[in-house]
Amino acid sequence: MLNGKRVLLVLPLLLAAFLSGCGQPDRDEVVVYTSRADHLIKPLFDAWSEQTGVRVRFTTDQEGALISRLQAEGANSPADMLITVDAGNLWYAADLGLFQPVEDEALLAAVPANLRDPANQWFGLTVRARTLVYSPERVDRDELSTYEALAEPAWAGRLCLRTSRKVYNQSLVATMIERLGEQQAEQVVRGWIGNLATDVFANDNSVMQAIAAGQCDVGIVNTYYYGRLLRNNPDLPVKLFWANQGDSGVHVNISGAGITRHAPNRDNALALLRWLAGEEAQSKLAALNLEYPANPAVDSDPAVAAWGEFEADSLNVEVAGRRQVEAVKLMDRAGYR
């Protein structure tokens, strides 16, 4: 039986041993916060875990909730990586100091400069194009040209749009501010609102369904929504048109990821991020959601490639975040709800 003196000596040692085991990284796991749906991301995590033996523990939630959670957790966060959609969200997380810069040759080679943070705090993993859709029964393709042209009187009562409350149209307007200046961009948005055939819709699918039903003739959507509808209805009476060709190019955005500032398992997070930007994962990622791979060495899914090639906007996608506050204020002034 231990006497009092021995207990006093042993207790600090036991306490130190206990504390040293708390909050320490697990070499066989990586923790990911993601706003991507389970069916779009879990197959990738499973494949990587099978190859490496490293388990991926992930939490799925809305991007805003995940960013707030990272903020609240601070240095005690268990998260090693944040994966989310839209460069605006990634920019915001970086602006809050939630990421750390990553200097990795493989990542820099895999992800083009305009699809990643200038300070390498986050990297694009897939590319989503936001372009025009139209009714081939009521619109001649020759009538179509640019996003800006949809503000012209010829489209009065013919345009459908998604609500401005979703980040996708905020990012589009942010890039317009960067290219055109605030005054001209606002004129365009006011023209859009004046040309609406109906109230704005909650999502891109509803925009295309309205076009198919004859409620309007033209709209602006992310192409993967078009691909999903087309997969379920090959006879969908809606077509894609690549906007701003020979001009600024089609507006593109990303889904992407960054390693968190206080990542407990940084090495595992870097290995996962590097793998996600590589050819195997890029092919799977793009096919799962009918998006474009960020890595230019990887071909698009055949269903996506069938839509044809297009010239994309070369602006760095970080503009979507840097100009987002201005874009939201502009849209509000213009009556775009």
Give the role of each language-model region:
Residues 1-29:
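Short, low-complexity disordered leader/linker segments with a strong preference
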Residues 22-92, 337:
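Early extracytoplasmic/lumenal segment of secretory-pathway proteins
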Residues 183, 291-337:
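An extracytoplasmic/periplasmic, membrane-proximal ligand-sensing/linker region
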Residues 157-165, 275-299:
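Periplasmic-binding protein-like
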Residues 88-92, 212, 217-237:
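A ligand-binding cleft/hinge motif common to bilobed small-molecule-binding domains
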Residues 224-258:
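A beta-strand-loop signature enriched in Asp, Gly, Thr, and Trp
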Residues 35-42, 61, 77-216, 248-250:
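Extracytoplasmic ligand-binding site segments that recognize negatively charged/polar headgroups
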Residues 131-138, 252-265, 284-287:
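A bilobed periplasmic-binding-protein/Venus flytrap-type ligand-binding module shared by bacterial periplasmic
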